[in-house]
Amino acid sequence: MSAPLSLFVTGTDTEIGKTFVSAALLHGFARAGLRAAAMKPVAAGAYERDGAWRNEDADQLDAAANVALPAAIRTPFLLKAPAAPHIVAAREGVALDIGTIVDAHRRACEMADVIVVEGVGGFRVPLADTRDTADLAVALGLPVVLVVGVRLGCISHALLTAEAIAARGLPLAGWVANRIDPAMPFADDNIDTLRAWLEREHRAPLLGALAHMSPPSPDAASHALDVNLLLNALRAAAPR
């Protein structure tokens, strides 16, 4: 059996569709015949149901995955308040330890063929005084998929994020254009610009451009993503 594949999903900002795209990728991987699991290592914002604390993003990932990870592996750190993780963690007396997440990821890799790891917020969200989500991606050593929320300002946000990813020595396996503003003028032109710049500067292909959906359907969106292109990039980036 080949070694499991894994990727780190980040975004140009918060609330731009990382969970939606991650769930769509999970559907695509499952359709490709892979055992697909998801991690949301740090989740901020919880609700209680049946005596257990849950998170809506994690619920969406669970619904899309065809391999269910134990909650403690899927989300090692579930914070109650929906705010910046390092602030909430400090108030709740929780240390967001990257080593704990790396260990959970190692265990997840024993259970599935491909693991989608969804970050929190953008690429550089503080987890502690001196560590952020970029440090987490480096510790995991994973190729990155960038979700670009297509709205005014997205070109600069995407290029800056791609630079930050490259500066940490991580491969940008591809990016997804997610149309979060259905009224945005020249959306296709923005996507075309990013396609050219990210390909030229980072050799990062566009994996798909997702139409605005209301309500969102990750399963439907998965058909617009080139999962095989991504799988080839992940295999090329995997340790030999």
UniProtKB/Swiss-Prot annotation:
Keywords carried by this UniProt record: ATP-binding, Biotin biosynthesis, Cytoplasm, Ligase, Magnesium, Metal-binding, Nucleotide-binding
UniProt main location, coarse: cytoplasm
Keyword flag Oxidoreductase: no
Required co-factors: Mg(2+)
Coiled-coil features, chain-numbered ranges: none
Active site (UniProt): 40
E.C. number: 6.3.3.3
InterPro entries associated with the record: DTB_synth_BioD, P-loop_NTPase
Role description: Catalyzes a mechanistically unusual reaction, the ATP-dependent insertion of CO2 between the N7 and N8 nitrogen atoms of 7,8-diaminopelargonic acid (DAPA, also called 7,8-diammoniononanoate) to form a ureido ring.
Entry similarity comment: Belongs to the dethiobiotin synthetase family.
Protein name (Swiss-Prot/TrEMBL): ATP-dependent dethiobiotin synthetase BioD
Originating species: Burkholderia pseudomallei (strain K96243)
This protein's encoding gene: bioD
